[in-house]
Design a protein with these regions (language model features):
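A short, active-site helix/loop in glycosyltransferases that binds the activated sugar's phosphate group
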Residues: 1-10, 19
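Short beta-strand->alpha-helix junction loop in the catalytic core
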Residues: 12-22, 67
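Conserved donor-binding/catalytic core segment of Leloir-type glycosyltransferases
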Residues: 24-41, 47-50, 176
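A structural motif in glycosyltransferase catalytic domains
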Residues: 31, 46-49, 62, 127, ...
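Nucleotide-activated donor-binding/catalytic signature segment of Leloir-type glycosyltransferases, i.e.
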Residues: 66, 76-97
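Acidic donor-binding loop of glycosyltransferase active sites
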Residues: 103-118, 132
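Conserved acidic donor-binding segment of nucleotide-sugar-dependent glycosyltransferases
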Residues: 146-156, 163-169
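A charged, aromatic-enriched C-terminal amphipathic alpha-helix characteristic of glycosyltransferases
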Residues: 169-193
Length: 193
């Protein structure tokens, strides 16, 4: 049987984050979601988690750090409206350096990708390299993230893990350190070698 690629000569090249690392700063945000504001990024689940935390009268600061693509703004406008209703700060169309600084002021990134976290998620790598604890969903390619992110099976499970973290912040230090080490090895310079 003939294949398109010779597997002995083919290698999968991992990705790295385009967001640089930044020294950790005084906390400004408890939780953020960031990336391109478009469908299929888990933004609705992030907003749902914020809404549930607000219902429980938990004090926290949240932000949506996002890039609004120029084509169809109807989805972005809906998300912006929902964030505003939940008192989630909107930080739109920031540079990579600005995003790095914002992440350095953040505790948790809620990144519930519908297909689960995987090595192709540059936003998760950007959070990890900036020492932000990543909360995401399990997926088919999530096994290597079991010890470097906090994974849930669905949004309710993720919410319970966020609530646990809020009350036990020190219990996740090892995961955060491991995530930083993982992401540090996944920079473009290392990949190019």
């Amino acid at each position: 049987e003939k294949t398109l690629f010779n597997s002995a000569k083919t290698r999968l090249i991992p990705i790295a984050s385009n967001i640089p690392s930044c020294q950790k700063k005084e906390k400004k945000f408890d939780l953020v979601h960031f990336g391109i504001i478009s469908k299929g990024k888990g933004i609705e689940e992030f907003i749902w988690i914020i809404k549930e935390l607000n219902k429980k009268n938990i004090k926290f600061r949240s932000a949506l750090i996002g890039y609004v693509p120029g084509a169809d703004n109807s989805y972005a406008n809906l998300i912006i409206e929902q964030c505003t209703e939940q008192k989630c700060e909107l930080l739109l169309n920031k540079s990579a350096a600005e995003i790095s600084n914002l992440l350095a002021e953040t505790d948790m990134a809620i990144l519930p990708y519908p297909d689960g976290i995987s090595e192709r998620r540059g936003t998760a790598l950007a959070a990890m390299i900036n020492r932000v604890l990543v909360f995401s969903l399990r997926g088919q390619f999530s096994s290597e993230f079991e010890n470097i992110a906090v994974l849930g099976n669905d949004k309710n499970d993720l919410l319970s893990k966020v609530l646990y973290y809020i009350n036990n912040t020190d219990s996740f230090a090892k995961i955060n350190d491991s995530a930083y080490e993982y992401s540090e090895k996944r920079n473009w310079q290392s990949i190019a070698q």
